[in-house]
Structure formats: C-alpha cells, structure tokens
C-alpha cells in the first residue's frame, strides 16, 4: 500500500514544496488549503505521478475538518504522515500598535487549526501505528523572543509544548511527533506578514541567504522516513547566515 501524507497549507511555501518532495518519493497526497484554484493547479502538476486528493479547507473550523477527514476517499484513508503546516504571522510591529483581530487570526490558525487537524487524524495515525508521524511546523520564534513576535511567537511556543505533550500521550502507539522549527525562510509567508508589502518582504532577504521552502520540505521528508524507532522531538533549522542576537537593553539617552 502506498504511503499517504496529509498536508495543510499546501498551496504555497513549505506545504507546496513538501507536496513535490513526497510526490517524488511516490507518496499519495492529501493536499489542503483555503485557495481552491491553487489546489487545483497543484493537483494538475502532480496527479500524473501520484494519487492526489485536494480539499478546500479552513483548518479553523473543527466541524469542517472532521467532515473532510471522515470523507477521505479510498486510497487516502490510511494517513501515515501529517504535516501540520498551515500557519501565518501578522502585525510585525510592537504589540501595543497591533490590531487585536490580527492576534485572534494567528491564534485561530496556528493553534486552533493545528489542534483541529491533529485531533481529527489521531485515530488514523494510531491505527497505522509504527512509523506514523506528525510534523508540527513551529518556528524559532517559539523558542527565542524578538521584537514584533508577540502572539506569533507565543503561538509557536504552544506548538512546541503541544508536540512534547502529545509525544507523552502517544507513547506506546508507535506514532512519532516532531516540532520542526525553521528560521528565516524566503517564502510567501513574509509577504503575508508584511500585509502584502513586497518591498518590505524583499528587504528582509536582501544581502543574505535564507532557507528555501525546499530546504524545509527536505527536513519534513527526512523526519517522516526515519527508522520507526527514531523520533526527533524538535528540529530547529536556521540558514548558516542566521544566529542569535544580543539581549536588548534600554539605555538612558
């Protein structure tokens, strides 16, 4: 039986790259996202190589998620790997200058959405057992604070701790859980964070070498295909040209 991967946020960035990486290895694909036209285009690219099932899905709606999982067609029901990739960052300015609605949007997607999809697929993953894998896409922002990270960083800290706690609950089932925490990566993610400001997005990467979506997709595939007795609890990935910075200190003028 062909291995099957369920990818959220598959229409761009890490998710899209992961779809191509897993397809290259012959996996069946369940691809989800909110933009149906992009899902259809991606299916068109891949379906000649592997079986592809697409779902226009808002992960924030638990009823919709449950119904989508319950309705998976034959050939896509035994999900071996879940890539919880859907997520976003908004409002990179200081917390006191943000709109509360942006905070709720990040929480609803990065936390509630991830929980919804995980809960819906846990019975399937447990049934698959040994070698089944959940890859939760976190961020270095979930471990290391920086200005403008506020709710985004906190949501990714949740992803990290949820992954650890889930590992404890799933002990003995054979299901593995990894918090995959990327650093700076040049994807559409940054354009969303800057509110569509292409110049601001480009400026973040100018003069350096960021991670690519394909770099992270390769790590996703590596985690999913490790020997069944091996689990990465957390994998933090930065480009070579990124590191931590000094503490911020408020000095008198």
From Swiss-Prot:
Pfam families on file: adh_short
The entry's keywords: NADP, Oxidoreductase
Active site residues of this protein: 152 (proton acceptor)
pH effect on activity, per entry: Optimum pH is 6.5-9.5.
Gene3D superfamilies attached to this UniProt entry: NAD(P)-binding Rossmann-like Domain (3.40.50.720)
Biological role: Catalyzes the formation of isethionate from 2-sulfoacetaldehyde in the deaminative pathway of taurine. The enzyme is specific for NADPH; NADH is not a substrate. Responsible for most of the activity observed in taurine-grown cells.
Name of the protein: Sulfoacetaldehyde reductase
Organism: Chromohalobacter salexigens (strain ATCC BAA-138 / DSM 3043 / CIP 106854 / NCIMB 13768 / 1H11)
Primary gene name: isfD
């Amino acid at each position: 039986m062909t291995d099957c991967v369920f990818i959220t946020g598959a229409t761009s960035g890490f998710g899209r790259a992961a779809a191509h990486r897993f397809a290259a290895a012959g996996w069946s694909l369940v691809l989800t996202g909110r933009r149906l036209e992009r899902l259809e285009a991606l299916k068109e690219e891949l379906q000649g190589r592997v079986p592809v099932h697409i779902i226009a899905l808002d992960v924030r709606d638990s009823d919709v998620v449950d119904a989508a999982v319950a309705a998976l067609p034959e050939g896509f029901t035994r999900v071996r790997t879940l890539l919880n990739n859907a997520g976003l960052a908004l409002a990179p300015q200081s917390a006191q200058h943000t709109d509360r609605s942006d905070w709720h949007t990040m929480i609803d997607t990065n936390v509630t959405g991830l929980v919804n999809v995980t809960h819906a697929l846990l019975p399937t993953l447990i049934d698959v057992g040994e070698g089944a894998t959940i890859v939760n896409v976190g961020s270095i922002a979930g471990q290391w604070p920086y200005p403008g990270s506020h709710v985004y960083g906190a949501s990714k800290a949740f992803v990290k701790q949820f992954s650890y706690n889930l590992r404890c609950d799933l002990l003995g089932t054979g299901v593995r859980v990894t918090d995959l925490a990327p650093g700076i990566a040049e994807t559409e993610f940054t354009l969303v964070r800057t509110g569509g400001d292409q110049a601001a997005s480009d400026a973040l990467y100018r003069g350096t070498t960021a991670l690519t979506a394909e770099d992270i997709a390769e790590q996703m595939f590596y985690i999913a295909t490790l020997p069944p007795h091996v689990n990465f609890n957390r994998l933090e990935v930065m480009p070579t040209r990124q590191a931590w910075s000094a503490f911020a200190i408020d000095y008198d003028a």
